[in-house]
């Protein structure tokens, strides 16, 4: 898997063979980042990070700080390995923790990406917690199965079996 754009365009991101995560496809990633636009100096949270590709793509496109959260130790180790590509040019933190416990720590972000396992997470609870964690005008990007019920208020786009929904926090 490669970074699509930005200062690290083309950089290969290693993945785990027979991984339990489902990496966001390049087509979906391109669409997400086209919708988000400029990320200069943003703080980003990549929940259910898997390979970390969404966070790495954000770093390549100018984000200043990325926090990766995943509860799988193998994924966390892989993200640490892949983060060496950035050689301290971006502030990166990798956390091995359950998403719900992490969000209780009261950090705030400009952008939150979440790509939870399809059909295994209470999506309404996830959306509620992520929206409270965003800074004003922050955006929450959620990838789900297109068959899942999504809370209202976001802008959705379908990609085969996947759906991307983006919410913007306004006061």
PLM features: what roles do these ranges have?
Residues 1-171:
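Class I S-adenosyl-L-methionine-dependent methyltransferase catalytic core
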């Amino acid at each position: 898997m490669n970074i699509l754009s930005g200062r690290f365009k083309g950089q290969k991101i290693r993945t785990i063979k027979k991984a339990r995560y489902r990496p966001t496809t390049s087509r979906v990633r391109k669409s997400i980042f086209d919708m988000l636009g400029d990320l200069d100096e943003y703080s980003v949270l990549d929940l259910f990070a898997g390979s970390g590709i969404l966070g790495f793509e954000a770093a390549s496109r100018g984000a200043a700080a990325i926090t990766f959260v995943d509860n799988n130790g193998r994924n966390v180790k892989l993200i640490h390995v892949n983060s060496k590509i950035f050689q301290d040019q971006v502030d990166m933190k990798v956390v091995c923790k359950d998403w719900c416990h992490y969000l209780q720590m009261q950090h705030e972000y400009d952008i939150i990406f979440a790509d939870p396992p399809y059909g295994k997470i209470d999506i309404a609870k996830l959306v509620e917690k992520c929206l409270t964690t965003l800074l004003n005008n922050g955006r929450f990007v959620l990838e789900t199965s297109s068959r899942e019920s999504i809370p209202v208020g976001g802008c959705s786009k379908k990609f085969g079996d996947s759906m991307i929904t983006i919410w913007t926090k306004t006061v």
